[in-house]
């Protein structure tokens, strides 16, 4: 089954690095689990607010530079946060990245505070 990005997801990627946008656009065509983009570019003020609220742990987020997106799984039109859905989405996104020659980091692979919805361009390649 092939899914497509909603206009809302596309709008949320405004200001995101074109390489990452291209990966997400390719991944939606091959993912076994539908997803939407929940967030892309953030202002430093919003990031500081998220840190104060405990929703983020860093003021140095890749969202601030447009090098990260967060996604949410969609099942029958509803957002789902079930952990088993996110490795399936990640497989599609990382496959699309490899095809496009883009080096990504998936938050679900982090040793501390795993963040399954988070994908960012690798700092070593995209400073």
Locate the predicted segments by residue.
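Active-site acidic/histidine clusters and adjacent loop/turn architecture
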Residues: 1-36
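Short linear motifs at secondary-structure transitions and domain/linker junctions
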Residues: 10-14, 44-50, 94
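Extended, low-complexity, intrinsically disordered C-terminal regulatory tails
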Residues: 25-53, 99, 104-107
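Catalytic cores and adjacent binding grooves of peptidoglycan-active enzymes
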Residues: 57-127
């Amino acid at each position: 089954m092939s899914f497509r990005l909603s206009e809302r997801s596309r709008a949320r990627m405004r200001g995101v690095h074109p390489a990452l946008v291209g990966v997400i656009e390719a991944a939606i065509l091959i993912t076994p689990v539908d997803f939407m983009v929940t967030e892309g570019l953030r202002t430093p003020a919003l990031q500081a607010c998220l840190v104060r609220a405990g929703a983020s742990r860093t003021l140095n987020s890749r969202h601030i530079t447009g090098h990260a997106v967060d996604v949410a799984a969609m099942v029958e039109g509803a957002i789902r946060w079930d952990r088993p859905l996110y490795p399936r989405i990640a497989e599609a996104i990382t496959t699309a990245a490899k095809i496009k020659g883009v080096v990504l980091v998936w938050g679900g692979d982090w040793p501390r505070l795993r963040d399954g919805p988070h994908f960012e361009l690798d700092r070593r390649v995209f400073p």
